[in-house]
Amino acid sequence: GIAWFSDFKLEEGTKNKSNNWNVACLIMKNIDTKLEDGKTLKINMEPKDVDNIKSNMERFKSACKTLTDGKMTVEYDTYEITEPIKTITYSDEYGYYIDPSDVESIVTPYLSKKEYDYIFVAVRLGDLDKNIEIPVYDWIGLRRNGLTWNRIFKYKIAK
């Protein structure tokens, strides 16, 4: 194949010598949207779901420190967001997934509070106990045009 760069710009930044990651964990507790087939998807997280997410985040925090022998640490802010997600994206390749555009207006106020190195968005897309299941073919992460989501928001907030 052939590849090339166009409109390439090299900028100088400041080196951050900190080994601590500032992470935002956004727990999106509710979805209320129409699916491609016209059906309504309405899911609300239960307290046990939120507790499970918080427990996993604590394990992530301790695992980063342990696995790097203290060379990387994590501090995070957790935001429980009750405003429902009104759209979710669908593609034949991936099924349903949360695209940054689906939640951007909801999460931007939280992300503008401080600078984050990484963003976790926790969403429940199904509930087997209630027989709610939608096709999700792969975990694809929150990216847009090959850029990590937090970089997009830093750019938009800075403008």
Q: Can you say where each PLM-predicted feature lies in the sequence?
A:
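Residues that flank catalytic or metal-binding motifs in active/ligand-binding sites
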Residues: 4-6, 21, 146-148
